[in-house]
């Protein structure tokens, strides 16, 4: 079957379906006339008519709203020239150039979010060219039915198809009478498909919190009253039902995003006042968002708080010093670090206890050495020990001064005992021995009778030495008294003559023994 025969059959079906709607005759031959920059049609009766309002997306609207075969008829002129159908009606019809229609109308349907808004004058010129290119397939109505707008037809087509059946159509006011409606009905399509706006603090939370927040905001937006936007009244023409139903659809006008955010914030504040009693403890990031309600995921702040408490407890147990009797055992920590800390603390406490025990033992021994010491404090006991040692040193010095002669430690004692003069003096006094141990008696000769015990000293040429306490006389000669075993002393001076005789008889030995004494002192 040729393509024009198929078109003729479909045109007959279309005319039979549209007989109930009054329409002007469309079978008359018309001419295309260019007048004042616009294309118009002129019939045989010389009546000039203006081009109907732009119908860029009439085919898309009929496909969505009606669901009938009119879409096939409207799409056939894309590939079939009108000359094939016009030859059967009038042979004198002048063929026209096959002009390809503009694709802006179709791009606005599929790429509505991307395409830029088009002015009304450009749409009228494009639609006029498309309509005059195929004059036999365009149907004009006298105001009862007109092609819906591109944006509103796509926005409302699915609802009309599901509510009123496949044989219903929409009748919206012409876009030419109110050209500002085009820009007002484009923006709601963009904002209606997007999820509701979320506050800035919601972006800082996990995805699960954001999901519940979006759902709650969506419910709140549906329940909250909004300001009355622009209202379009649409008249529905039923093919089977004789009743006319008027459908009021509110299309939200395009408002700035800042105003929408302000509305959402005000709604959130109202909702928060109502649900302040039901607020759940949340983290610092989500504070102030009590409208979210109880979240599905577990609270992160509670876990963090619980772990911090456990760490503080473990640290306090490690630092606390345990007493000897009441000793606490550190609780089992969940981490290996806590167990290591507890072990190190136990070892440290054990070593400290042992050190304190040793110190206590030494202090008890010192307390026993100090007479009449009843102090318990360590500092007090040490003070008592210091005072006692000072008193002992003073007593030793007094006893050494009372003996009458006190020589330096380098002369009195060997080099090994020079550091302990007081102890050596006390030892000599306790044994009944004089200070000048190892020094010869200068007042007597070698044949003189020694009254004390004698012993030989190395380096002294094996001469007997009398142990006596020497005294310094005025003439520089040593004249001392010998010590008797019972501790009594005998004066050797006697009378004056005896003293002179003793001195004369001992002059030579004195010189000889002085040299030996000098030799001992030099060797020492």
UniProtKB/Swiss-Prot annotation:
Its main location: nucleus. Residues 343-358 have a biased composition (Basic and acidic residues). Phosphorylated by PHYA; this phosphorylation is repressed by PIA2. Dephosphorylated by TOPP4 during photomorphogenesis, leading to subsequent degradation of PIF3 by the proteasomal pathway. Changing residue 186 to K: In strain: cv. An-2 and cv. Su-0. The keyword Transcription regulation applies. It is found in: Nucleus. One of its GO terms (molecular function) is DNA binding. Residues 38-70, 141-194, 239-259, 281-358, 483-524 are annotated as: Disordered. The keyword DNA-binding applies. It holds the Pfam family HLH. Residues 40-49 have a biased composition (Low complexity). PROSITE patterns: BHLH. Residues 343-392 form the bHLH domain. Sequestered by PhyA from its target genes promoters in far-red light. Changing residue 236 to I: In strain: cv. An-2 and cv. Su-0. GO terms for cellular component: nucleus. Induction: By UV treatment. Repressed by red (R) and far red (FR) light treatments in a phyB- and phyA-dependent manner, and via a PTAC12/HMR/PAP5 regulated process. Up-regulated by abscisic acid (ABA), ethylene (ACC), auxin (IAA), salt (NaCl), cold and heat. Follows a tenous circadian rhythm with slightly higher levels at the end of the light phase. Expressed in stems, leaves, seedlings, fruits and flowers, and, to a lower extent, in roots. One of its GO terms (biological process) is response to water-immersion restraint stress. Transcription factor acting in the phytochrome signaling pathway. Activates transcription by binding to the G box (5'-CACGTG-3'), particularly in the dark but barely in far-red light. Acts as a negative regulator of phytochrome B signaling. Represses chlorophyll biosynthesis and photosynthesis in the dark. Recruits the histone deacetylase HDA15 to the promoters of chlorophyll biosynthetic and photosynthetic genes. HDA15 represses their transcription by histone deacetylation. Promotes the expression of MDP60 to modulate hypocotyl cell elongation in response to light and ethylene signaling. This is Transcription factor PIF3. It comes from Arabidopsis thaliana (Mouse-ear cress).
């Amino acid at each position: 079957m040729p393509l024009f025969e198929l078109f003729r059959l479909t045109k007959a079906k279309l005319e039979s379906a549209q007989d109930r709607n009054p329409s002007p005759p469309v079978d008359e031959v018309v001419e295309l006339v260019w007048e004042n920059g616009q294309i118009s049609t002129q019939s045989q009766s010389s009546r000039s008519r203006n081009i109907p309002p732009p119908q860029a997306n009439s085919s898309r609207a009929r496909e969505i709203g009606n669901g009938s075969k009119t879409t096939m008829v409207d799409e056939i002129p894309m590939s079939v020239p009108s000359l094939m159908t016009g030859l059967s009606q009038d042979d004198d019809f002048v063929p026209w150039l096959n002009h390809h229609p503009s694709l802006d109308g179709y791009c606005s349907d599929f790429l509505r979010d991307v395409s830029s808004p088009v002015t009304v004058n450009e749409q009228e010129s494009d639609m006029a060219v498309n309509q005059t290119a195929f004059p036999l397939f365009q149907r004009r109505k006298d105001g009862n039915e007109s092609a819906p707008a591109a944006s509103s037809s796509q926005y409302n087509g699915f609802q009309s198809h599901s509510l009123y059946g496949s044989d219903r159509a929409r009748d919206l006011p012409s876009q030419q009478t109110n050209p500002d409606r085009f820009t007002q009905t484009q923006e709601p399509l963009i904002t209606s498909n997007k999820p509701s706006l979320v506050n800035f603090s919601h972006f800082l939370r996990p995805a699960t919190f954001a999901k519940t927040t979006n759902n709650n905001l969506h419910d709140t937006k549906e329940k909250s009253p909004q300001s009355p936007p622009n209202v379009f009244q649409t008249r529905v023409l039923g093919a089977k039902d004789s009743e006319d139903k008027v459908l009021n659809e509110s299309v939200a006008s395009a408002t700035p995003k800042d105003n929408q955010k302000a509305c959402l914030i005000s709604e959130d504040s109202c909702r928060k006042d109502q649900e302040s009693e039901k607020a759940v403890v949340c983290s610092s990031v989500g504070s102030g968002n009590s409208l979210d309600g109880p979240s599905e995921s577990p609270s992160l702040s509670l876990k963090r708080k619980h772990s911090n408490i456990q760490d503080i407890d473990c640290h306090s147990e490690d630092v606390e010093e345990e007493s000897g009797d009441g000793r606490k055992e550190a609780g089992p920590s969940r981490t290996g670090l806590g167990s290591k800390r507890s072990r190190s603390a136990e070892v440290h406490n054990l070593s400290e206890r042992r050190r304190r025990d040793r110190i206590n033992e030494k202090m008890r021994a010192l307390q026993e050495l100090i007479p009449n010491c009843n102090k318990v404090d360590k500092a007090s006991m040490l003070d008592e020990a210091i005072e006692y040692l000072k008193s002992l040193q003073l007593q030793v010095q007094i006893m050494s001064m009372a003996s009458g002669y006190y020589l330096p430690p380098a002369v009195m004692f060997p080099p090994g005992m020079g550091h302990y003069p007081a102890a050596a003096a006390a030892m000599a006094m306790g044994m009944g021995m004089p200070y000048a141990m190892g020094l010869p008696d200068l007042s007597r000769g070698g044949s003189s009778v020694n009254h004390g015990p004698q012993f030989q000293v190395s380096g002294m040429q094996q001469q007997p030495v009398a142990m006596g306490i020497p005294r310094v006389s005025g003439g520089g000669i040593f004249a001392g008294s010998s010590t008797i075993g019972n501790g009594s002393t005998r004066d050797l001076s006697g009378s004056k003559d005896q003293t002179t005789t003793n001195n004369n008889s001992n002059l030579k030995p004195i010189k000889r023994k002085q040299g030996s004494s000098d030799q001992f002192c030099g060797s020492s």
